[in-house]
Amino acid sequence: MFFLKNLKRTRRNPAAPRQNHLTLTVGILLTASASFAEDRITLNTKDDGYRGIWYMNRPLKSVYKYKYSGGLGTYCAKHKPFAVCCDTVNKTFFCYGGTSKANNRSLIHMVSYYDHEKKVVPRPTILLDKKTGDAHDNPVISVDAKGHIWIFSTSHGTDRPSYIHRSRKPYDIDAFELVPATRLQDGNQVAINNFSYFQAWNLPQKGFVCFFTKYGWGADRALAFITSSDGVEWSER
């Protein structure tokens, strides 16, 4: 509707420069495209319970069946942290790899908290559908100095994208927004859209320090770290 209204207005004003018409139209289309892309990723809906993903790895020809398997909603050991205690609001915020009622091997990224005063947990927020059954894609969590909750959605390798989300309000899990994060590469800002085995730490008055694995950075698997004061623009690896 906004696009159509502006088209009508420009038609009524023949004296307006043609270049301005094009700029306005392109700007609206780009904004709509970005919003659509975010809406397809960020769900911001509520679940009616807690269901962690079940996952198995490397079938074996023995009585053990798999190298490992079971409920792996907070897998793996390299991912940190899954929970952050915030004394300011007396709550511990946490994330985990959830799943749907229909399929316990479909990975959904979930966010919630434990209220230490009331000793209860709310209905968790469904952040996004990772479109995989691989628990290596489980998320990790961080909380910045202003109380905003950050979720880093990892990927196992390069076949799937990674995402960074931030809560719209401090200490609140009801709504998250996709962060258009970038990092320095050869003096230019490039999109951050893939990372594995992520660890995210927020330091007072300094911001984020993150450690992770990146595939294809001069080796099959490279260990790296990046920093950021705001979570949007990140340093070079």
Where are these regions (language model features)?
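N-terminal secretory signal peptides that target proteins for export/translocation
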Residues: 1-18
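Generic detector of N-terminal low-structure segments
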Residues: 4-5, 22, 38
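Short linear sequence elements within intrinsically disordered, low-complexity coil regions
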Residues: 7-8, 25-26, 59, 119
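Short stretches within intrinsically disordered, low-complexity N-terminal or propeptide regions
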Residues: 16-18, 34-36, 83
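Bacterial N-terminal signal peptides
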Residues: 23-32
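Extracellular, repeat-based ectodomains that mediate carbohydrate processing or recognition
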Residues: 38-237
